[in-house]
Amino acid sequence: MKKLGTLLVLFLSVIALVACASGKKDATSGQKLKVVATNSIIADITKNIAGDKIDLHSIVPVGQDPHEYEPLPEDVKKTSEADLIFYNGINLETGGNAWFTKLVENAKKTENKDYFAVSEGVDVIYLEGQNEKGKEDPHAWLNLENGMIYAKNIAKQLIAKDPSNKEFYEKNLKDYTEKLDKLDKEAKEKFNNIPAEKKLIVTSEGCFKYFSKAYGVPSAYIWEINTEEEGTPEQIKTLVEKLRQTKVPSLFVESSVDDRPMKTVSQDTNIPIYAQIFTDSIAEEGKEGDSYYSMMKYNLDKIAEGLSK
């Protein structure tokens, strides 16, 4: 009986050791953190900080709308297996069809334990006429200062889950935020030199509020957010009437939306569409705008050029 008791203790000890080993994700164990990001922008910021220390899966494909998405079986599997999940929050993946809320519930994941909003700490801007939870404008990353907040939040959670690589994450965070900060300062100087009467960024979706606040360029749009009606005759008429009262030289259309409504606005106002710009997604790998940094630099350059015409 005593021998049986000893064997039982040894067995339980082995199980405990195995459990501890399997739960530890660091360089010494040879196991990488399994990390999921909801879209390509968050995934790219994560990659810049974590490098090859993690296995990373991005849910919403490049070029697709993250407001309303239907997760694939692979997304469900990766989310269930993930050690760490990063999502934007502030009404992006949890608005519309609330696809992310359903995904993490099905995966039995817990907020602020398994999944984290990278927008934590951002000064939230709300949709026009709204000021309540669920009515936030989610496009905070279009202000580079917020992009730096995202990066810091991501690094914080990576370090918490994988402390053995703390110095690696901190060094990458420092280098990355310095790079973003330099671009941010250059952009503010660039937009200061554009005449006030030309300062109006016109897009299909009203997603440039954070950009407008950061760089002093007011914005106008056809529809406010991609979860509502998009490009109705009434929406187009309202924008056309507004633009006829301005001297704005150029229009812009986002890479992830149907460009036909903006083409109608352009025809009705004789204002050309200057460029396609990025909002909800980076570009395909190898193309201009295929990272958060390069998409923001591209946007800033093209918008400044278009408004200087």
From Swiss-Prot:
- Has keyword Lipoprotein? yes
First and last residue of the signal peptide: 1-19
Q: Does the keyword Manganese apply?
A: yes
Determine the domain of life of the protein's source: Bacteria
Q: Mark the residues modified by lipid (S-diacylglycerol cysteine).
A: 20
Record lipid sites (N-palmitoyl cysteine): 20
Membrane topology according to the record: Lipid-anchor
Where does it reside?
Answer: Cell membrane
User: What GO cellular component is one of the record's annotations?
Assistant: plasma membrane
**One of the protein's GO biological processes:** cell adhesion
One matching Pfam family is ZnuA
For this UniProt record, give its keywords in alphabetical order, as a comma-separated list. Cell membrane, Lipoprotein, Manganese, Membrane, Metal-binding, Palmitate, Signal, Transport
State what this protein does.
Part of the ATP-binding cassette (ABC) transport system PsaABC involved in manganese import. Binds manganese with high affinity and specificity and delivers it to the membrane permease for translocation into the cytoplasm. Also acts as an adhesin which is involved on adherence to extracellular matrix.
Q: Which family does it belong to?
A: Belongs to the bacterial solute-binding protein 9 family. Lipoprotein receptor antigen (Lrai) subfamily.
Protein name per UniProt: Manganese ABC transporter substrate-binding lipoprotein PsaA
